[in-house]
Amino acid sequence: MQLCARAWGLRLGRGAGGGHRLARGTGLSWAQRSRDSSGGGGGGGGGDRGAAGASRLLERLLPRHDDFSRRHIGPGDKDRREMLQALGLASIDELIEKTVPASIRLKRPLKMEDPICENEILETLHAIASKNQIWRSYIGMGYYNCSVPQTILRNLLENSGWVTQYTPYQPEVSQGRLESLLNYQTMVSDITGLDMANASLLDEATAAAEAMQLCHRHNKRKKFFVDPRCHPQTIAVVQTRAKYRGVLVELKLPHEMDFSGKDVCGVLFQYPDTEGKVEDFTELVDRAHQTGSLTCCATDLLALCILRPPGEFGVDIALGNSQRFGVPLGYGGPHAAFFAVKENLVRMMPGRMVGVTRDATGKEVYRLALQTREQHIRRDKATSNICTAQALLANMAAMFAIYHGSQGLKHIAKRVHNATLILSEGLKRAGHQLQHDLFFDTLKVQCGCSVKEVLGRAAQRQINFRLFDDGTLGISLDETVTEKDLDDLLWIFGCESSAELVAEGMGEERRGLLGSSFKRTSPFLTHQVFNSYHSETNLVRYMKKLENKDISLVHSMIPLGSCTMKLNSSSELAPITWREFANIHPFVPLDQAQGYQQLFQGLEKDLCEITGYDRVSFQPNSGAQGEYAGLATIRAYLDQKGERHRTVCLIPKSAHGTNPASAHMAGMKIQPVEVDRYGNIDVAHLKAMVDQHKENLAAIMITYPSTNGVFEENIGDVCALIHQHGGQVYLDGANMNAQVGICRPGDFGSDVSHLNLHKTFCIPHGGGGPGMGPIGVKKHLSPFLPSHPVISIKPTEGTWPVGTVSAAPWGSSSILPISWAYIKMMGGKGLKEATEIAILNANYMAKRLEKHYRVLFRGARGYVAHEFILDTRPFKKSANVEAVDVAKRLQDYGFHAPTMSWPVAGTLMIEPTESEDKAELDRFCDAMISIRQEIADIEEGRIDPRVNPLKMSPHSLTCVTSSCWDRPYSREVAAFPLPFVKPENKFWPTIARIDDIYGDQHLVCTCPPMEVYESPFSEQKRASS
């Protein structure tokens, strides 16, 4: 790997001899200095000394000026000095000594390569990406090449205003993406023919596992039928999930399924199936329903544009992958899975869901609905452990549907189907046998000649097929297939006719699905939004209108505790849309993805060095998925040791809600551990719990630093205690941003962690996903890491893998270059510095705010970690002001709220990250101090306790510019409460405060159909939609 400017000499010329161009036409290029110590002849050692002297002079003349860490870390030297002075400290080293226990501090620098220049990182990544070979892949199995509209790529996927938003917990500043996600839900509901859909899940396979769990929850039965013609990765993920949920999965063809025992919770089938066959499942659905079993259909949205939807033959749950709606393959992800249900199952549905409610003025608005069923509230009793899903990719798919409309989607579907019909006819003419007569886009072919010969000809054209175990070949076509592609496919199979000649021989008679009883006749996407933005001009304006409604990192800091909303730099994000990363099918042979393999290996090596673990699995594609995978790995390890009875998992009460939800998913029995008044694990209670459950102890789940924002002094003792009693230590990586370069979980006793790459390592949050949650493990757990049924991702000898946890072998592969680039550009020193500044920023803010709010928890020497909790509970009694009032009022100051009422109800948790400079920290602190003064005004009777800027917040532009203003405070106080909040730079909430209760009581989670717009809108029609 090349070094930066200091390792290069400057040379005039045209770049002869392999120099790397600085810029076209400049006549300048870089040439690497010789490392030959011989001096090159008669000059002897003097030549070396002259070269060394020249080098030092050159470094002085051409000092490095593109140190990425200086771009990533907000506070400069002056800011740091001032913050340290405010804390009464002489240096950052002193701060770290007083914050992080000496017993766990890393005594050496991280062993990592020197940082790569920001300008050079893209060149290095280009070299890696070029090792990926972009063949035409007709493998299918839920993954298809597609045409990504450039307007969506540029204005959404590559737009920081869309990708740096957080999950829309604050709807008043999130109406844009909430509307887009409602469009996505409507799209899914319409196309599948079901009543309600959620706002995305992680991938098709995990959506199928969630469907199985829903069936099990619904009727408490413990047998689940799976049609073996589902995609193999889907079957594997369902089997892995079922193993720890006590559900028996049986692979049965429909005619083999016996429901007479009334012990079957549900059945899963694929429509069209993995071989491409379209068949009628009506009879199976009816048989299942007669005995109270639910039916789950894995399906394809594009196929359903011309194929009878599952909702029309009684299916209860439909699921699948929306990837082919304008989202790149990306070697497996990220993609948005869809999940739709009948209305009677909506309150059991996993994942986030957008619904309609009203704001304080009565205006219809959007919000996240039914949150009481989610992990952050219900913990181990939640419908799922899902936290981050795939909002950004769901938004892309929704925009794809909006851009094309129903007619455009039908056109694409018919084109794909017609191409498949032409290919099928040509193959039959060439003497090959098709296994199925009715299909959409996939053919299973019994070759009439040598398969080896066919595959050899395919390799000549750089084309991939699917090879079935029985020696047949699978060919799945997509919307990018051209006439030339068809000609190449026909040539590979020895057909002497061209696609044009085959088509002419077929004529225009309706064939295939369009001439069968399976043809779709019902309308879909009738809502106005899918019929208004078919020109690029209109779509760009619509996307911009939505973007402008949402606060993101382009506006101001997002101080959400435990969320690490740091910079997502352009250099890190740029490579994810390169075709060498974007256009690779996840199941291509490994020799076609050598660039990806090199990147995985390098990232794994760096993450192991950073964490102290020995191996990393990249398969989990979210933090919650990583928790489940890590705990399941522990279960597999204990099972192999003959300790299957160990199922108790200890979890502190301060833990994130995903912890107990994930432990429950892994089949563990949760035992809560108390937290003392200082925010630490109550060691006495922990010891009592360990002693009580020592025979059955499987693990403890801890977060470090704790969710209360402190480095607990006795973390090593806690880990040792668990190990002494036969348990394993799972350390939640949510707060890894306070550890990198300073301490390593693998050194102080942790056995496994998930790493939130979308927090610590700069993958953007995307408004609610994507995320990545790879797990790092110590050596003894490495043989149990996840495997995959299609692609071998680890040696099989001496391993007992836990199973498969995600659809793709390496999860959401295409966003891993972001974290790789961040680590390479920062280097070991820069990564440690980022951690130090994150801790400095948090302590500076805590210091500024401590005179106005109580800082709830501090470490042993009075300092916080990278985040801290402000106690707003006393204001409920003194002024009838709650945390939610402070959160909404912050919107008027231009800020997203901190994490609200977690981990302690009635509080606010603040995490500034290292990317924010002192000026931004001060603006936020000024806002909080100003709000405290507004609370004091209520306490002291200077303003009305019911009608005041806090209770009436946020103040939208419509509100402030209304001709009627009857509030006992001025418009200026409402909208411009401090000098830095100015008309020219203010972010405006677009609605008044929402009514959560009304939204859950009047659940509407799709857009109404076009008929609504034929007459004045009515509540009755909206409810019936």
Swiss-Prot record:
UniProt feature, compositional bias: Gly residues: 38-50
Broad EC category: oxidoreductase
Biological processes annotated in GO: cellular response to leukemia inhibitory factor; glycine catabolic process; glycine decarboxylation via glycine cleavage system; protein-containing complex assembly; response to lipoic acid; response to methylamine
One GO cellular component term: glycine cleavage complex
Positions bearing N6-(pyridoxal phosphate)lysine: K759
Record: transit peptide: 1-35
Cofactor: pyridoxal 5'-phosphate
Region (Disordered): 16-51
Molecular-function annotations in GO: enzyme binding; glycine binding; glycine dehydrogenase (decarboxylating) activity; lyase activity; protein homodimerization activity; pyridoxal binding; pyridoxal phosphate binding
Domain of life: Eukaryota
Main location: mitochondrion
Transmembrane segments: none
Record field: catalytic activity: N(6)-[(R)-lipoyl]-L-lysyl-[glycine-cleavage complex H protein] + glycine + H(+) = N(6)-[(R)-S(8)-aminomethyldihydrolipoyl]-L-lysyl-[glycine-cleavage complex H protein] + CO2
Modification N6-acetyllysine, positions: K452, K519, K653, K669
EC number(s) given by UniProt: 1.4.4.2
UniProt subcellular location: Mitochondrion
Activity regulation field: Stimulated by lipoic acid. Inhibited in presence of methylamine.
Gene3D superfamilies the record matches: Aspartate Aminotransferase, domain 1, Type I PLP-dependent aspartate aminotransferase-like (Major domain)
Transmembrane as UniProt keyword: no
Assembly: Interacts with GCSH. Homodimer. The glycine cleavage system is composed of four proteins: P (GLDC), T (GCST), L (DLD) and H (GCSH).
UniProt-listed HAMAP family: GcvP (MF_00711)
Family indicated by similarity: Belongs to the GcvP family.
Function: The glycine cleavage system catalyzes the degradation of glycine. The P protein (GLDC) binds the alpha-amino group of glycine through its pyridoxal phosphate cofactor; CO(2) is released and the remaining methylamine moiety is then transferred to the lipoamide cofactor of the H protein (GCSH).
Protein name per UniProt: Glycine dehydrogenase (decarboxylating), mitochondrial
